[in-house]
């Protein structure tokens, strides 16, 4: 599975958290996020339809609107992306990936220790 873009990911985070949703509900929720740019209803509609075309969401009619529900759960998506990063950037070598992560200056000592234990 290919990675999805930032706006698609915001939509998916909402749906993973709240379950099956209408475009209207997602539009309202994303526009209510503090500091986030305001998005047109048609933008959210297009994003959700594109996610449905990619097999990430299911779209079904419900009266005059449509309900979109996840076909891919959050854990499955994250694992797929992590596997892709491991293969594409580290030749499948998990220790190289963990080694680079441990060099991240933003990590706390506790997080570094956890990475060290994971790679041991």
Cite the ranges covered by each PLM segment.
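Short, cationic-aromatic polyanion-contact patches
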Residues: 5, 62-81
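Short, hydrophobic-biased segments on the C-terminal half of alpha helices
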Residues: 45-49
């Amino acid at each position: 599975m290919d990675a999805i873009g930032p706006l698609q990911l915001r939509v998916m985070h909402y749906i993973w958290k709240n379950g099956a949703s209408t475009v209207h509900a997602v539009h309202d929720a994303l526009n209510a996020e503090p500091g986030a740019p305001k998005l047109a209803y048609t933008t959210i509609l297009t994003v959700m339809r594109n996610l449905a075309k990619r097999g990430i969401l299911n779209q079904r009619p419900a009266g005059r609107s449509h309900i979109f529900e996840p076909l891919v759960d959050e854990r499955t998506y994250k694992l797929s992306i992590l596997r892709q990063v491991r293969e594409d950037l580290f030749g499948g070598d998990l220790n190289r990936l963990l080694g680079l992560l441990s060099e991240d200056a933003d990590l706390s000592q506790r997080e570094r220790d956890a990475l060290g234990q994971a790679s041991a």
